Amino acid sequence: VHIATLAGIILILLVIVLAARGCGKISHRTPEGVVEGYIKAAAAGKNKKMQSCYSADKLSDEAKTEISSTIKYFQAHGVKDVNIDSCGSISENKNYTYVYIRYNLVLENEQEYPCISTYLVKVQDKKYYLYAPSEISDKISQQAAKDYQKFMTTKTYTDYTKAYEVFLKKNPGYEDKIAGKLNG
């Protein structure tokens, strides 16, 4: 009995150690991994982790602004946590993968605010990174707009819009409240 208990304790400690080692790191192994890591870091207000999602040693001012704006946006909502619903590829070619992420911001009152975001992801040295805004050409931007238009007809997107509308009906004036926090 004692050996079984000891083995159980060792197993639990091993699981805790392995889980702790994997927590909080940004995965650069897949386009979706870097996007999920970026959103989780934003929800936690982790500026440095968000910066690590970009490949540049020196981040452009646009990328820094995007990071700080995203953190400010999440803070305006009073985010406690983020629940990722789905994350996948909208389109891909040899230069980039266009990734969507559908997630809910868990608010202080335990309600979940539906969100959807898209990111362009590139591969560099066999790792995936977000495109900095300054790296996105007009050609890429135009193609992404066409791809997004198609994405808007998918079940993922229509489910998001329905969830968003339900949230707003339950919380009239919510958008104005957030806009006031962001502009004030």
Locate each region found by the language model.
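Short, low-complexity N-terminal intrinsically disordered segments enriched in polar/charged residues
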Residues: V1-K40
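Short solvent-exposed beta->alpha transition segments
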Residues: G24-S27, K48-Y103, Q111-Y113
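Short, aromatic-enriched amphipathic alpha-helices that serve as compact interaction elements
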Residues: S27-K49, A163, K170
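C-terminal and inter-domain tail/linker signature
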Residues: E32, I67-Y73, D138-D147
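Sec-exported extracytoplasmic/periplasmic mature domains
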Residues: I39-A43, S55-L59, L107
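A short, surface-exposed beta-strand/turn
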Residues: P114-L130
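Low-complexity, intrinsically disordered terminal/linker segments enriched in charged
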Residues: L130-G184
